[in-house]
């Protein structure tokens, strides 16, 4: 039904947003620190 399809689409979008958010956080952490070393002391 249309309702089920709508909820499926919303769920998929929610997962995509959550995944993107997690990826962005991971990327930021990688930028801010290299192997646990603060960016200020990294090369």
UniProtKB/Swiss-Prot annotation:
Per the record, GO CC terms?
A: extracellular region; S-layer; spore wall
Show the disulfide pairing.
Answer: none
Q: Please provide the record's keywords in A-Z order.
A: Cell wall, Repeat, S-layer, Secreted
Give the domain of life: Bacteria
Record bears the keyword DNA-binding: no
Q: Where in the cell is it found?
A: Secreted, Cell wall, S-layer
What does the UniProt function comment say about this protein? The S-layer is a paracrystalline mono-layered assembly of proteins which coat the surface of bacteria.
- The name on file for this protein is S-layer protein 1
Q: Which organism is it from?
A: Bacillus thuringiensis subsp. konkukian
């Amino acid at each position: 039904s249309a309702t089920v399809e709508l909820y499926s689409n919303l769920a998929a979008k929610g997962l995509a947003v959550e995944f993107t958010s997690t990826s962005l956080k991971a990327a930021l952490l990688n930028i801010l620190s290299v192997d646990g070393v603060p960016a200020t002391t990294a090369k």
